[in-house]
Amino acid sequence: MKKTSIAIIFLFMGLQLAAQTKYLRSIAETQELSKDVVSLFKENNIAASFEQLTPYWPMPQNELDAIEEKTIKYLNIIRDRFGKPIDTLKIKNETIADVALRETYLVRYENTAIRIIFTYYKNDYGWIVNAFKWDDSFTEEFE
């Protein structure tokens, strides 16, 4: 009986996790999500940006929470040191056939910029966030 109960609990947990995952239906939707998240980054509304990403990013919630917390901390430091955000700029769009897409943006501050990279993967159900990264290494974008 215990084994059955445990199996049922894990089944419901698995169903709950699967039910939480949403899929983007097109590249246009991935681009819209990226643009919205970057705009929220510029406004320093990190909590809202993660709320936008989370339904499409199959990652444990505790890991997402940790990334969000660190992002809030470091973006506040960037704003204090390098001034207010000025604007955003999409700088690159890369694809691997019809299965992967990477979009790169800059959020420009008064005295520096941060780079935001979204990687999307297309599975049988649609597009998901495969990776999301931001850093201050925008100079790596020079060719």
Can you say where each PLM-predicted feature lies in the sequence?
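Short solvent-exposed beta->alpha transition segments
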Residues: 25, 31-32, 47-99
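Short, low-complexity N-terminal intrinsically disordered segments enriched in polar/charged residues
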Residues: 18-43
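Sec-dependent N-terminal signal peptides
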Residues: 4-15
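Exposed beta-sheet edge and beta->alpha loop/turn motif
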Residues: 92-143
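A short hydrophobic/aromatic micro-motif that marks alpha-helical segments and, especially, helix-coil
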Residues: 17-18, 60
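Intrinsically disordered, low-complexity segments enriched in glycine/proline and serine/threonine
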Residues: 5-6, 19, 66
